[in-house]
């Protein structure tokens, strides 16, 4: 038995459960949504769930939005490891064969998956900077962490991957685009949830500007 829930589409929903096969409970069931997928960074999941559960419990826009804004501020303080996407490179050996034929330096082939492309950039830069003895390359079966890069950058790349730790030797030339990361990981999730309940979701950075316009009647 559930008291309420949010339904996004078939097999994608969140329910507040009060009775589980005759046992009284107070829990949430997440099905098919990003917060239960392995691609969402683990460090972010408790915060995302807290906002979702507040949204369902209170049904109050201002209370929920306050937590959403706090999440935006928190996101900017987290380490790269805490916000990077994580995905398995199951067939990197096949992809790397293609890179040898179709990729030239930092130019990749059309349709290359972003996590594979990011792993390729990482491996390529390790070789380019003679760091293969210091850091492990990404191979088939490995998990790769990846993130969107600030533009412009020295290599003209949109994303970068790494295996365990992001090499400090790369940090002068490559920086994470935290605004874009927040948009892809957090904002996109709540944009769909807000829309499902008839709320308007605005990016926290844009809220202040909009509120000022309202205040000044511009």
Regions found by a protein language model. Give the residues of each.
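DNA-dependent DNA polymerase catalytic subunits
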Residues: 1-218
